[in-house]
Amino acid sequence: MKLHITTFAALGLALISATTNAQEHNIKYLGDHIYLQTEVNGKPANLVFDTGAELIYLDSTYVADQNFNFKLIGNAMIDGAGSDGPAKTKIIIGEVTVTASGKTYKPEFTPLVNLRPLLGNQADGIFGMKAISGKIISIDYKNQTLSLHDKLTPQMTEGYTCIPVKIKNRKILVPMTINVNSQTTISGDALMDMGSGQGIEITSPTATKHSLDKISDKTPFAFSSGGLGGKSAGYTINIANANIGNIALQTQKAAYSTDKKGSMASADYIANIGNKIWSQFDIILDFANSKIYLRKN
């Protein structure tokens, strides 16, 4: 999911505990989302693992159901995926503690947002990348584990393909080529977004640049989820093939956005890539060296 805070930019997440050993998390892969099984202030919480987000977010319904008594509340502006633009939302300041597999994270602030209309009723919040981007992160969809390592060893990458990437504001941009048809090829950086349950979603500036509106065989879509999702619309089209680096993807469908605002109207990347693609692979994320490693699972 593509989310960013537009105020309080200097604040961050404090990692309370650290380890030199691999830390393994059991995850659930449901509805094309990765769920980390955590505790929030001592109460169970399923947080969506999201490489497209930076912070930890909590769902407003989850917070109400748990009867948390947070006292330090502020406000911030947050952009979402849809076309409504930034929205004012409440933030909890310094009172949230998240525990996962024995490790504790205490965000300096936590946005309180209406996530379930966008992600589903299983989602109690989002776990973004700021808290763990200093680690090597390995994700195994089939065996449903996510592991954090202090360093990358040659044994860990056996059988994987290394792909150099760009890291901007803890977001991962991967090199991508989309062959729409014999006349249209789209190449550039695409956002790695494990918070998305979709496949390849082409941004509206890229769609306009390549005249995708002229494709006649397409299916419209639109949603208005409320919360961070806002309103979003576009079309699903057939494509010939697509690659990440030199790795061919198993898909012959893509969507393109017609949004005028929001992250799908961004010119910073050509497309957003969600879990319908990433679940085809075992994955290792190496932020420090701007690399990811992929292996067909």
Question: Where on the chain are the PLM-derived regions?
Answer:
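Pepsin/retropepsin-fold aspartyl endopeptidases
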Residues: 21-297
